[in-house]
Amino acid sequence: MLLSKYFLPVLKEEPSEAQVTSHKLMLRSGMIRQQAAGIYTWLPLGLKVLKNIENIVRSNMNKAGALEVLMPCIQPAHLWMESGRFDNYGKEMLKFQDRHDNTLLFGPTNEDMITDIFRHNIKSYKDLPKNLYHIQWKFRDEIRPRFGVMRGREFLMKDAYSFDINEENAVKTYNQMYQAYINTFRDLGVFAIPVIADNGPIGGNLSHEFHIIAETGESTIYYNKRFKTLKDNPNIDVEEIKSWYAAAEEKHDVNKLPISEQEITSSKGIEVGHIFYIGSKYSVNMNALINDEHGKLTPVEMSSYGIGISRLVAAIIEANCNEKGIIWPSNVAPFKVSLINLNIHDSKCVELAAKVYKELSAQNIEVLYDDTEARAGSKFATHDLIGSPYQIIIGPKKAADDIVELKNRKIGVIEDIEVENLIHYIK
């Protein structure tokens, strides 16, 4: 992509309305623009990150055996009345009437609707287990939306719902999805800690939250110091990870610790995922019954699995930035490489930049080629801000010898590389 053709409205100054780093950087780098309180337009750069995260989440759900569906944003209120949740959500739920005076709502979650889909289409234990997921926009009318997309009113979620014949099988599915979540965050290139948590209004008695460590987190989590080894060794067996102590603040009890208090540390965390074993709460209330192997009608056992995709964008930035801007993990970066031509009027620079751009593109490496008239300092500031993992810098002096500068955005090291060897460093 040529920067001269791209839509990248970067801001030089910090926006006064932004309170946290991720919100500031998302506005400054031209990822989002606010349309109303807690409601944002995703501009091209931000949308690329959102789609990259969405695709990684989707890939891991598919590998776990979940099947993708797409439920509507707008839901009939009678399903929520039937499940007993309609009055509990209060003013956070956006409700309205259509022209026929039917009460509708903008879905804040989907347990009620997926249970309705299940009960009308699956009747026998022979059709179980089933695990259905969708990726859809939601709305909760937060009384005080803040921190940009971290705590917005409109947000993108991945929600999965599993259905099993009994508790034993349901817990087995739950553990498989726990594994899928560990794999998902590894693939995203982020350090997420799974902590034992409350189920809240969803219901149920088994629950884990997944937190990214960040100073701006709203939750305090307590966890075994061994979790820090995941940063350097992400391939630790999931069963070992599950044996390590980690708990949300409301579940942490210093009098009931399985390890010494000296082995535990605490941090602020941003919740980016939450999985629940619900049991039969919704199936009983909504009559979602299955014929078991003895021909007896029994309520189906359910679990729910959420990942905040739009919130993940902000959380990843909070954990991966410095004073110059964002430092994207490679798998979610909007562009893996920023190609910076320092002199677009120098024929050798133009020739070399075109060659590099063509070779990287042929390898399906996403490149943002800065072919603008901007000064060198301005170009460096822009590309540090948007956070491409690599910057390839082409200037007249070194271009004459077919040499470019390669900057690793994360560690800040710049080295001279011969063009013919460049591809090996990027891959």
UniProtKB/Swiss-Prot annotation:
InterPro entries: aa-tRNA-synt_IIb, aa-tRNA-synth_II, aa-tRNA-synth_II/BPL/LPL, Anticodon-bd, Anticodon-bd_dom_sf, Pro-tRNA-ligase_IIa, Pro-tRNA-synth_IIa_bac-type, Pro-tRNA_synthetase
Pfam families, per database record: HGTP_anticodon, tRNA-synt_2b
Catalysed reaction, written as an equation: tRNA(Pro) + L-proline + ATP = L-prolyl-tRNA(Pro) + AMP + diphosphate
Top EC group: ligase
PROSITE patterns on file: AA_TRNA_LIGASE_II
Compartment(s): Cytoplasm
Molecular functions (GO terms): ATP binding; proline-tRNA ligase activity
Keywords recorded for this protein, A-Z: Aminoacyl-tRNA synthetase, ATP-binding, Cytoplasm, Ligase, Nucleotide-binding, Protein biosynthesis
EC number: 6.1.1.15
A GO cellular component annotation in the UniProt record: cytosol
GO biological process: prolyl-tRNA aminoacylation
Family: Belongs to the class-II aminoacyl-tRNA synthetase family. ProS type 2 subfamily.
HAMAP family per record: Pro_tRNA_synth_type2 (MF_01570)
Subunit structure: Homodimer.
Record-linked NCBIfam families: PRK12325.1, proS_fam_II
Function: Catalyzes the attachment of proline to tRNA(Pro) in a two-step reaction: proline is first activated by ATP to form Pro-AMP and then transferred to the acceptor end of tRNA(Pro).
PANTHER family referenced in this protein's UniProt entry, alphabetically: MITOCHONDRIAL RIBOSOME PROTEIN L39/PROLYL-TRNA LIGASE FAMILY MEMBER, PROLINE--TRNA LIGASE
Identification of the protein by name: Proline--tRNA ligase
Gene name as annotated: proS
